[in-house]
């Protein structure tokens, strides 16, 4: 199905020359002279590159053949992440490169969204908030308060986040996966 210029918006998935993209920024421009156009930044699902594209009044884009599946992370074996489809129990292996930066938030049993383009896995999305255990951080000192500064903490996945001084090794915390920021202790 063709997508017209007036339908473009942030987050929309489009296909140009057989490559699926997501619109990350969108600006409708109406110059004093001439026809209006849309300037957009689009990110490729295949290689992650961001390009700027201008769409003019009669331009059309195709809707990509994308399918999203909920899959559960099983284990990591030397360069490949193993996932299982939660409905069909079919298993797939994705390389470290295919999983990308979100690997630092993935723990055993975590359900993720995997996006497929023409039956090929192209991206992995983790939940916005994950609960992880702190494996290493500096000990508390007298006078450390919850409103004080921050200290680095290594999580069970190897990711390092800044946490308040009162947070201890072995505690479970919630982390925002988009920003990598500490949110709160798990109660």
Curated annotation (Swiss-Prot):
Gene3D superfamilies xref list = 2.30.30.30, Nucleic acid-binding proteins
Which locations, inside or outside the cell, does it occupy? Answer: Cytoplasm
Q: Which UniProt keywords apply?
A: Cytoplasm, Elongation factor, Protein biosynthesis
Metabolic or biological pathway: Protein biosynthesis; polypeptide chain elongation
Asked if S-adenosyl-L-methionine is a keyword of the record, the answer is no
- Provide the GO MF annotations for this entry: translation elongation factor activity
Q: Give the GO terms filed under biological process for this record.
A: peptide biosynthetic process
A Pfam family matched in the record = EFP_N
User: Where does the signal sequence lie?
Assistant: none
Question: Which family does the record claim for this protein?
Answer: Belongs to the elongation factor P family.
Role of this protein: Involved in peptide bond synthesis. Stimulates efficient translation and peptide-bond synthesis on native or reconstituted 70S ribosomes in vitro. Probably functions indirectly by altering the affinity of the ribosome for aminoacyl-tRNA, thus increasing their reactivity as acceptors for peptidyl transferase.
Task: Give the protein's recorded name.
Answer: Elongation factor P
Q: Name the gene that codes for it.
A: efp
């Amino acid at each position: 199905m063709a997508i017209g210029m007036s339908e473009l918006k942030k987050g929309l998935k489009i296909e140009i020359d057989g490559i699926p993209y997501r619109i990350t920024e969108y600006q409708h421009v109406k110059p004093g002279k001439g026809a209006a156009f849309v300037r957009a930044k689009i990110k490729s699902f295949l290689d992650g590159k961001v390009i700027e594209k201008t769409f003019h009044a009669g331009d059309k884009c195709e809707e990509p053949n994308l399918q999203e599946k909920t899959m559960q992370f099983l284990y990591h074996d030397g360069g490949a992440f193993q996932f299982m489809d939660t409905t069909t129990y079919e298993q797939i292996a994705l390389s470290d490169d295919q999983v990308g930066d979100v690997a630092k938030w993935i723990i055993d049993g975590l359900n993720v969204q995997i996006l497929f383009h023409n039956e090929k896995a192209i991206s992995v999305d983790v939940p916005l908030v994950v609960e992880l255990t702190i494996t290493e951080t500096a000990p508390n000192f007298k006078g450390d308060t919850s409103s004080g500064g921050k200290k680095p903490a290594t999580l069970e996945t190897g990711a390092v986040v800044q946490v308040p001084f009162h947070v201890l090794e072995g505690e479970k915390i919630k982390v925002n996966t988009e920003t990598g920021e500490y949110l709160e202790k798990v109660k």
